[in-house]
Amino acid sequence: MAPLTEARTWGMTMFDQLLCRISFKELRYLGEFTPPATKWSLVTPSAMGGQNWGSASYDPVNRRLFLNDIRLPNVRRLLTRAEYDELIKTEAPTPDGHNLAPMAKTPYAIHSKSYISQLGVPCAQPPFGTISAIDLDSRKIVWQVPAGTAEQLGPLGMKLGLPLTPGMPTYAGSSTTAGGLVFYAATQDYYLRAYDAETGEEIWKYPLPVG
C-alpha cells in the first residue's frame, strides 16, 4: 500500500476532501509504521490490519494464496494516565474505531480513532478493502478486486442503497474450492460471493440476513 500524501486524501465532496487535506497537514506522519506520540499521529496501515487481519485460503494445485485486506488509516495519540482517567469519563469506545485503552506497565494510554471526514467517510482514497490472488512462485499479484459495495453504508450513517464499488474493509478470510471458485462473505454489504479463482471475476452473489 502506497504511503498516504496530502494529494491522496479523499472525500465524497470537495468540501470534506479539503477538510481531510487540512487535517493531514496538521497530523504527525513519518510514513509507514509511524510510532505513537503525544501529538495526534497518522498510522497507515492502521492497527485494524493490512493484509494480516483476516485469514487466507490456498490453492495447492496452482499455488495461489487468496488474501483480503483492510486499507483504513487511523489517528492516535499517547495520553498520560491522568488524562486517560479524565477522558474515559466522557468518551467511550465506538464501532467506528474510536478507542481509549491503557498501556500495561507504562505511564501512558492510547487514544485512537478512524481517520474520517465530518461526513463519516474515510479520508483515504478507495479501495478501503480488496481481495487478491497471489502467485506464490512469482510472488506477484495475479488479480485484485474491490471487496464489496457501499449498499449498506453512506455519509452521516445513512444507507445509500447504491451498488457503488469502493471496496470495503474486510473482516474474515475466504474459502477456496478445487472447482476454481473463491467464496467470500465478510464484506459490509451482506452478500456471499463467488469469484473465479483464475480471473477474480464475480460470478455469483447471494444476499445474507447479516454481515
Language-model regions: role of each:
Residues 1-211:
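Beta-sheet-rich non-transmembrane sensory/scaffold domains
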